[in-house]
Amino acid sequence: MTYTVSIDVAAPAELYDTFHAALLKHTGGHVDGLLAHVAWPTAASFRIIEVWTSKELRDRASRDIIPQVWATLTATAPGPFDAMPVEHVEELDTCGLIIPSADLAV
C-alpha cells in the first residue's frame, strides 16, 4: 500500500528551488518512506506529487524535517524569507506505481 499526495504551494518556483537544494543538503536525498517526489511550476505557484510508503512517514517528515530545513534556510540564506508557505494537500488514490530503477511495482 502507498500514500500519495498532491501539494499546491502558493509561492514562486524560485522558492521551491532554494528550499529543495536546502532539503537535499539536509537529508542527503533520503527521507524515510519517500518513494517518489516530482515538482513543477504552475502559473502562480508550484505543485508537487509525492508517493510515500505510509501516511505516518509523510506526516513525520512534514512535522520534523520540513520545519527544520525551513528554519535553517531562513537563518542562513540571503533573501526575504517569511513564514513557511501554506501547503494545500490533497490525498490521491493511487492505482499503481512502477519504479523500475528501484525494482518497485505496486
Could you tell me what each predicted segment is?
Residues 1-71, 75-106:
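Short S/T/G/P-rich N-terminal loop/turn motif that feeds into the first structured element of a domain
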